[in-house]
């Protein structure tokens, strides 16, 4: 199995601006399983610009539409759970059953967020954590 992975920027898959790649290696056997596109500062700038544009659209999206979109993401994750888990296993060496659980957990988080978009109360709750991302 050998794959080429691009960058998803502004709604489409593409190579990096300088066509650079790096090897994706299976840590269990050190086999090359693919090549991923190596982002340049130009690519990062394009991604940030696209994200800023997307945020302006998302801000104007009705809560029920946001919920629908986020739920579809959860559905797609579940639909592709087996292949995503397989790739996770190859890329990070995680046991397949554990990878499937992690992928399922990601879908659960999207489902939870889909429901939360329906509950907009106009309040902000501060994090108790001192670690901010």
Where are the language model's segments positioned?
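Hydrophobic face of amphipathic alpha-helices that form TPR/SEL1-like repeat modules
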Residues: 1-28
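Conserved small/polar residues in nucleotide/adenosyl-binding loops
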Residues: 131-133
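A generic, residue-level signal for flexible/boundary positions that often mark functional hotspots
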Residues: 3, 8, 33, 52-55, ...
């Amino acid at each position: 199995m050998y794959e080429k992975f691009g960058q998803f920027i502004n709604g489409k898959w593409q190579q990096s601006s300088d066509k650079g790649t790096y090897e994706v290696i299976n840590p269990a056997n050190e086999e090359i399983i693919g090549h991923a596109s190596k982002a340049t500062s130009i690519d990062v700038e394009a991604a940030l610009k696209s994200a800023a544009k997307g945020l302006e659209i998302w801000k104007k999206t009705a809560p029920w539409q946001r919920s629908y979109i986020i739920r579809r993401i959860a559905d797609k994750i579940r639909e592709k759970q087996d292949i995503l888990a397989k790739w996770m296993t190859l890329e990070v060496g995680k046991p397949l059953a554990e990878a499937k659980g992690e992928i399922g957990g990601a879908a659960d988080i999207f489902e939870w967020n889909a429901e939360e978009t329906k509950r907009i109360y106009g309040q902000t709750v501060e994090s108790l954590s001192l670690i901010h991302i």
